[in-house]
Amino acid sequence: MNPPKSAPDAQGLSYRDAGVDIDAGDALIDKIKPFAKKTLRDGVLGGIGGFGALFEVPKKYKEPVLVSGTDGVGTKLKLAFHLNKHDTVGQDLVAMSVNDILVQGAEPLFFLDYFACGKLDVDTAATVVKGIAQGCELSGCALIGGETAEMPGMYPDGEYDLAGFAVGAVEKSKIIDGSTIAEGDVVLGLASSGIHSNGFSLVRKIIERANPDLSADFHGRSLADALMAPTRIYVKPLLALMQKLSVKGMAHITGGGLVENIPRVLRDGLTAELDQNAWPLPPLFKWLQEHGGVADAEMHRVFNCGIGMAVIVSAADADAAIADLTAAGEQVWKIGTVRATREGEAQTVVV
């Protein structure tokens, strides 16, 4: 088959001419391999670069059930682009998925990421993946694969999108599904590290209205750093707690805040009554509420308001759970109790 005729002065086109730099992709793989290597754990078969990533379920599980989760970082990325700050969003990506699967009692086993951009900036992408690897280390799971998609024209220069995928395992007999939660149980709240990765469309609107100096000091760090603080990963302290006492239910406080996430683990007929005075509203949320004129109800529906994970235990176990989690470095408060639902009310009420 003869190639099509072209104009005498025309030169042959390459993939790079079309906007895809294969060499940059190869350079990125070389840069991130050491980060991924630090996350290796028992069960990983092979390294990065194969068509599929292999993982052997640990033999300690007699009846393993796999638990999967996927998520992104949302419009927090827009703030990362504006600040040219890319070192925290990788941990956000991991946290969003591993905290979700943890809620059902699962130990995170492995993680995969998807990084999409219009033009690949190797240093930026490597910084993001380094954060992903750090998140995997914090949660004890292996970064065993991923995809970097350079797609000219799909994203503006300097912007990218992220997606993450986590898989964990839990013994079938130890799945946490909220079925044992009963009246009188206690709701514990574990402190968040900040806004985490939800509500940033409202955050950005507040910033647009208030026009603050993001480099200004805000309680010992810049306002930018406070806004971009990575999502806290609760895996190790909560897995340890599950070995010591009965955790009846957990809720990762993400989009929808406390009032929409806690009901996801409650049986019909039960309500979690939360006391908003039981824990301090962190200064960053006070700042957002003040500068945005955000009502209390909207704050509780959009933001975590200082509580990143809710844990439900029996009243008899509450003090022991608090002591154990505090010793593990968590800030914990008794934020509410479980009671029978009253006619016409929601499954989580804040009083």
Swiss-Prot record:
Subcellular location: Cytoplasm
Pfam families the UniProt entry points to: AIRS (PF00586), AIRS_C (PF02769)
Record's keyword terms, sorted: ATP-binding, Cytoplasm, Ligase, Nucleotide-binding, Purine biosynthesis
Stored Gene3D superfamilies: PurM-like C-terminal domain, PurM-like, N-terminal domain
Entry's EC annotation: 6.3.3.1
Gene Ontology BP terms: 'de novo' IMP biosynthetic process; adenine biosynthetic process
Principal subcellular localization: cytoplasm
Catalysis performed (reactions): 2-formamido-N(1)-(5-O-phospho-beta-D-ribosyl)acetamidine + ATP = 5-amino-1-(5-phospho-beta-D-ribosyl)imidazole + ADP + phosphate + H(+)
GO molecular function per UniProt: ATP binding; phosphoribosylamine-glycine ligase activity; phosphoribosylformylglycinamidine cyclo-ligase activity
GO cellular component: cytosol
Pathway in which the depicted protein is active: Purine metabolism; IMP biosynthesis via de novo pathway; 5-amino-1-(5-phospho-D-ribosyl)imidazole from N(2)-formyl-N(1)-(5-phospho-D-ribosyl)glycinamide: step 2/2
Keyword Ribosomal protein included in the entry's annotation: no
Family of the protein in this entry: Belongs to the AIR synthase family.
Name recorded for this polypeptide: Phosphoribosylformylglycinamidine cyclo-ligase
Source species: Burkholderia cenocepacia (strain HI2424)
Gene: purM
